């Protein structure tokens, strides 16, 4: 496995971990909405996690394009 493949595997792991955190945070936000006043902190954390996910997905796209370039050489 070359360096690019290792970076891709790492990016995939990080994305999977973020997705799990986002699911948990969405449950926290939903619970806050269902039980009382909204929680700005919980919503802010969810927004930050979703923003991080978008960044990691873009990073993964860059890694994939580099991997494809390597294979075509």
What is the predicted function of each stretch?
Residues 1-73:
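Anionic, Ser/Thr-rich low-complexity intrinsically disordered regions
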């Amino acid at each position: 496995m070359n360096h690019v493949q290792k970076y891709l595997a790492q990016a995939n792991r990080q994305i999977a971990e973020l997705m799990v955190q986002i699911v948990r945070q969405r449950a926290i936000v939903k619970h806050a909405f269902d039980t009382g006043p909204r929680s700005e902190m919980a919503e802010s954390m969810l927004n930050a996690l979703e923003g991080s996910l978008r960044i990691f997905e873009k990073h993964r796209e860059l890694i994939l394009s580099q991997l494809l370039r390597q294979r075509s050489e």
